[in-house]
Amino acid sequence: MNFKYIVAVSFLIASAYARSVQNDEQSLSQRDVLEEEESLREIRGIGGKILSGLKTALKGAAKELASTYLHRKRIAEDHEVMKRLEAVMRDLDSLDHPEEASERETRGFNQEEIANLFTKKEKRILGPVLGLVGNALGGLIKKIG
């Protein structure tokens, strides 16, 4: 009879040990998932800060260009440039509200058309820069969204 109790107690101990090992494995996998979620949140936070910095820089550049055109006499060409700059400013402001931006598709700007409004020197500088910035922002928005 003592042998039956020893076997029963041994079986209970073995099953309790197996359950504790299984619980440990589950808690480790849950901890891994939580660590991955935390690192993703950190990456999103860094991406958000970079995007915010780029947005601020672009807003500043657009405001500077707008103020430059305000101080000169407005001709039809300048008026078009101002309209485009205002559209860019609205698009940059929409980055503050991603839920609204995701509802509507972001507009693509015809880089050649914008670049033709500037002189050749400005064209050589701004054309590639606007293209790179547009591609970078598009890539970041896709990754974040």
Swiss-Prot record:
What range does the record give for the signal peptide? 1-18
CC terms in the record's Gene Ontology section: extracellular region
* Keyword Secreted in record: yes
Q: Which residues carry this modification: Isoleucine amide?
A: 144
* GO biological process per UniProt: defense response to bacterium; defense response to fungus; killing of cells of another organism
Q: Does the keyword Signal apply?
A: yes
The places in or outside the cell where this protein is found are:
Secreted
- Tissues showing expression: Expressed by the skin glands.
Q: Which domain of life is it from?
A: Eukaryota
- Primary subcellular site in the record, as a coarse category: secreted
What residues does the annotated propeptide cover? 19-43, 74-124
Record keywords: Amidation, Amphibian defense peptide, Antibiotic, Antimicrobial, Cleavage on pair of basic residues, Cytolysis, Fungicide, Hemolysis, Secreted, Signal
Q: What does this protein do?
A: Maximin-3 shows antibacterial activity against both Gram-positive and Gram-negative bacteria. It also shows antimicrobial activity against the fungus C.albicans, but not against A.flavus nor P.uticale. It has little hemolytic activity. It possess a significant cytotoxicity against tumor cell lines. It possess a significant anti-HIV activity. It shows high spermicidal activity. Maximin-H3 shows antibacterial activity against both Gram-positive and Gram-negative bacteria. It also shows antimicrobial activity against the fungus C.albicans. Shows strong hemolytic activity.
Family statement drawn from the similarity comment of this UniProt entry: Belongs to the bombinin family.
Q: What protein name does the entry list?
A: Maximins 3/H3 type 1
Which organism is the protein's source? Bombina maxima
